[in-house]
UniProtKB/Swiss-Prot annotation:
This is tRNA (guanine-N(1)-)-methyltransferase. It comes from Borrelia garinii subsp. bavariensis (strain ATCC BAA-2496 / DSM 23469 / PBi) (Borreliella bavariensis). Keywords: Cytoplasm, Methyltransferase, S-adenosyl-L-methionine, Transferase, tRNA processing. It holds the Pfam family tRNA_m1G_MT. Coiled coil: none annotated. HAMAP family: TrmD (MF_00605). One of its GO terms (molecular function) is tRNA (guanine(37)-N1)-methyltransferase activity.
Amino acid sequence: MKFTVISLFPAIIKPFFENSIMKKAINKGIVSFELIDVRDFSKDKHKRCDDLSYGGGAGMVLKAEPMSFALEHVEATKKTTIFLSPSGIKYTQELAYSLSKKEEIVIICGRYEGIDQRIIDLYVDFEISIGDYVLSSGEIAALVLIDSVYRLLDGVINPNSLLEESFGMKNGLLEYPHYTRPYNFMGIKVPEVLVSGHHENIKNWRLFKAREKTKKNRYDLYLKYLEIIGEDNGFDKKN
């Protein structure tokens, strides 16, 4: 998969591709990337890429011309273009799985008040919001999307990890609690079931704790889970 990021500040993005698991994925040939600086496509002598908003209002808007030139520069026939914006559709793990099947993802990083709507109308396949909050940097949102997608690609991480983690393909629940050494930390001991060696009991404990956490922290996901399994198996009676 190739990630192409169009940004006013590509230097924010670059280090992510040079470290940790992403670096290994690139070395394996699983991932490639291109960073495009919108300023390189500005015809303004000062390389400005923003202007005042028609109709008035606070803040500046990214201009259509340099953004259009930057997008036309991308040489890909099977690209999916995404603009990250608080006004977009809600980003979910399900959408991350869908995007992980694409060949190339082009990400437009917003700044200021956003970009000229005509760029969205002409070029964007998905306008996506990573949450109900506002960032000053579209680059941060881009990194969230990139990280959530590339880790789903074959050969990046252990596929079993994807089944057990929060929002995983297995059941959609939040992940169960984890413990490691030491056994006793500040008077709190690891639950006995986890050191019992009884794999079936451990499996049942983890499912119970995952359901418990999901019900407490994300009741909306808990209700979806109940719809999937068709019943609550008496879980509510235990709490």
